[in-house]
Amino acid sequence: MAPPLRPLARLRPPGMLLRALLLLLLLSPLPGVWCFSELSFVKEPQDVTVTRKDPVVLDCQAHGEVPIKVTWLKNGAKMSENKRIEVLSNGSLYISEVEGRRGEQSDEGFYQCLAMNKYGAILSQKAHLALSTISAFEVQPISTEVHEGGVARFACKISSHPPAVITWEFNRTTLPMTMDRITALPTGVLQIYDVSQRDSGNYRCIAATVAHRRKSMEASLTVIPAKESKSFHTPTIIAGPQNITTSLHQTVVLECMATGNPKPIISWSRLDHKSIDVFNTRVLGNGNLMISDVRLQHAGVYVCRATTPGTRNFTVAMATLTVLAPPSFVEWPESLTRPRAGTARFVCQAEGIPSPKMSWLKNGRKIHSNGRIKMYNSKLVINQIIPEDDAIYQCMAENSQGSILSRARLTVVMSEDRPSAPYNVHAETMSSSAILLAWERPLYNSDKVIAYSVHYMKAEGLNNEEYQVVIGNDTTHYIIDDLEPASNYTFYIVAYMPMGASQMSDHVTQNTLEDVPLRPPEISLTSRSPTDILISWLPIPAKYRRGQVVLYRLSFRLSTENSIQVLELPGTTHEYLLEGLKPDSVYLVRITAATRVGLGESSVWTSHRTPKATSVKAPKSPELHLEPLNCTTISVRWQQDVEDTAAIQGYKLYYKEEGQQENGPIFLDTKDLLYTLSGLDPRRKYHVRLLAYNNIDDGYQADQTVSTPGCVSVRDRMVPPPPPPHHLYAKANTSSSIFLHWRRPAFTAAQIINYTIRCNPVGLQNASLVLYLQTSETHMLVQGLEPNTKYEFAVRLHVDQLSSPWSPVVYHSTLPEAPAGPPVGVKVTLIEDDTALVSWKPPDGPETVVTRYTILYASRKAWIAGEWQVLHREGAITMALLENLVAGNVYIVKISASNEVGEGPFSNSVELAVLPKETSESNQRPKRLDSADAKVYSGYYHLDQKSMTGIAVGVGIALTCILICVLILIYRSKARKSSASKTAQNGTQQLPRTSASLASGNEVGKNLEGAVGNEESLMPMIMPNSFIDAKGGTDLIINSYGPIIKNNSKKKWFFFQDSKKIQVEQPQRRFTPAVCFYQPGTTVLISDEDSPSSPGQTTSFSRPFGVAADTEHSANSEGSHETGDSGRFSHESNDEIHLSSVISTTPPNL
């Protein structure tokens, strides 16, 4: 049966259909005004890691009114498409083959997409495109030996991106992790407990990423059989937790591995006594703490404690877990609608670790502050809104963990019946600080104008402040004063009516006239020699220059005279050298700058003393730099001349306010190159001078002046912040602690005050390592610091939910650790019968600081009785003299190093045997050398036994050869004389008389007359010098006490004299002991060789002493030239050195 037919629908009237159609149109998503929605991102690019030659797609999809154009930026610069890089239809970026560092152009970097439509543009978050990389192993397993039943630990460390997965192999096979006593930590550590013989073998780790795989070196584990009975020992943590910095949602492991008998129990706690999160935390292996899905609340200090069961014996180790978090918004900017000439304020706040950096964008471009637009930490303020300000604004928060953006739109509403802009604006310069501005009334609705506003700002530079002046409608000109001289300004005018403001007028730019400089340059004075002063100065800041400096006038005079000498220098000059001055005199110097208008104010007289004229080499003046840090603090920096070879013991710093007494000296160490002067007065001029000094005298000083600026008031605060603590004082307590003390600010309204101390090493780059400590006292002992490290400290106070600024920074160094080792290379050399020279080298270790050495020496008899003789030397000296030694004894010598913290261990004992004196030699050698003489002889006579033997053999051979030659010459001379006599008797020839003048003595000339055929044999065979060396030797005569240069006075050679006279005079010739005088100040050794009873036969020898002249000895003497103060000996560090004469004897062979 067919279904019944449905009744036909009733026809609706046309009016109802029309209303339904209109409702459908209103609800339909039509384009244009009907479907307007703000521009936003549906998908943004994300961080990605790829391998070379792989394709990659960075997503970017925007939503809003079409058409939407998408462009891409890489590292802030616009990208262009090519064969490899293409922007897809949905806005995403496609790279077909990623190029790495080896290619011509790397694709690594930060990418952002920019979406734009007719309402504005927005910028996406940053996405980092990185290549998969892996480095070489930073830490590899090390072979070890472990007792059976003990614990073994191997470690691997490697840097890679993404992080590598580390596994372990045992004897080249994968190490199973099924046993509880073996634990492999994700950080690359392998732990083995209850080691047995089956664990012996080779271990290595394997690091693998998606694209790389590396194997470490093998390390062997040797198991030593255990003893039958194990002795008790307290727990020891052999691998404690390390400080870790991680990101949110990562997994971290805090290692804690301990040994002991019995096996210790390992427990974990937090230093702040908070409970450990049990849901995301578990113990891995035998005591390692693993935290998964790390959150901000997991940050803190964790303490590992190893305890002996059933006892209170325990040991602890701790580490800090720092959790970094990407930025997140706390407050978002909201879209605004404002009229023309109104003010718009956007507020945006974000948090993160580390604190994010805030910036603002307009249509995807970074905003820079100017007169109308100002940016604070969390605000964007736009004054005097113009139509061009209608745009989309974004707040961007960025830190090391990422970036986020939030957007808002500013809509500018314009009134239809507003007046037109003022026109025909022009400016005229009136003076160095005033400009006249004039304009015409608006062409339309000028009768409705109720006021004008004049806007002006500096034309040069960024972040210039814009100023506004409101005047009535009854005038069309205005004089703007209080302007800066020699500056360009930009002006525009706005007209106001009850319905709103007009458009801006055209901009005009005009400059002010020049003026005289507001203040003089700040000068620096140094000396390079005792007769000059180098005057240098910095250019005057533009704020105070007030024009172009064309001239400097330099004035100087002696402090004891009234006459002033004046020099005029070009405006491009910034230093001048005054020469021809008097040494050790005080000079006064001042300077004046001038522009085209005229001279400005002169500086105050600055004094400088020229150095003394002395032969002692004093340290040169350091290069000094002063910089005001704030209105009460000046940073003093300096640098010593690298070419300065003078020894420096430290620095002296003086400073004074202009017209006040000088403060100082402040003694600074040689390592200090920075000092902060705090607690100064604002807007004051200070004079600072610095010099280097040593144990001899002060060096050349550097003088400089600097002015402190005025204090700037804190803006945008209803309640002013409290003042910071002052008079912060630091003093080193130990090598790992510094005591701080400060004063409370002078206010008593609040009773409860807390302080925060900031502490970090100078030059620290990682901000997460800065230490913050809390206290309610005005003093604190900061512990756990590194030895011999310079730290900076600052303090701020907290009261009534307000925090003060940080106090001026104070720098101080921890004390060094006591020397851990003894001096090395100890050597003892006998240089006289009763004097020995001991030398050494500083203890090993670059961080070892030595301020004093202690030398203990004693004979064996005294050593057995415990009686030591003690000498002390400064840390810069590495040698000393041991005097008054007794012959026939064996001496024991040992040395230790010490500093202000403590004394290090003594070196191994070194023995020195002093041989008994021989009677024949005892009368010919000096009995004793004092300290001053030893200083001279140490450069020449530091010879060992082998060297003395070689010299003696050489001298003996030389004397034998000379004696043979003399005998041969005498024999030949007799033969020739006999032949000449016979020839004279025969009357055949006659000798020219000129030949006789070549011989020494009249007697020889008479005997040689008449020799004709043997003229050449009558020439002297030896020149007046001691000898002739064809190899370029010197006329040096060496005896057992060192080298002596013979005088060049003429002598009579024996073989030129008559043989009869020789026989008569030979018995009368004798050698007397030579006397050597050491004359203080001349350093010359004088030897009188002949007896005072035989005048006319005197032959003197002289030789100036100096280490530099002994080129041969410097290659063979060890320890005598290691310091610049070598030879500066005394029994005590404060003994005076007396220079005395030394009586010496000349051996008979000379």
Swiss-Prot record:
Leader sequence residues: 1-35
Entry-linked SMART domains: FN3, IG, IGc2
Places the protein is found: Membrane
Protease in keyword set: no
SUPFAM superfamilies in the cross-refs: Fibronectin type III, Immunoglobulin
Transmembrane parts of this sequence: 950-970
Domain Ig-like intervals: 36-130, 135-222, 235-322, 327-411
GO BP terms, alphabetized: cell-cell adhesion; negative regulation of neurogenesis
InterPro entries recorded: FN3_dom, FN3_sf, Ig-like_dom, Ig-like_dom_sf, Ig-like_fold, Ig_I-set, Ig_sub, Ig_sub2
Keyword match Acetylation: no
Function: May play a role in anteroposterior axis elongation.
Family per similarity comment: Belongs to the immunoglobulin superfamily. DCC family.
Name of the protein: Protogenin
Organism: Homo sapiens
Lineage per the UniProt record: Eukaryota, Metazoa, Chordata, Craniata, Vertebrata
Gene that encodes the chain: PRTG
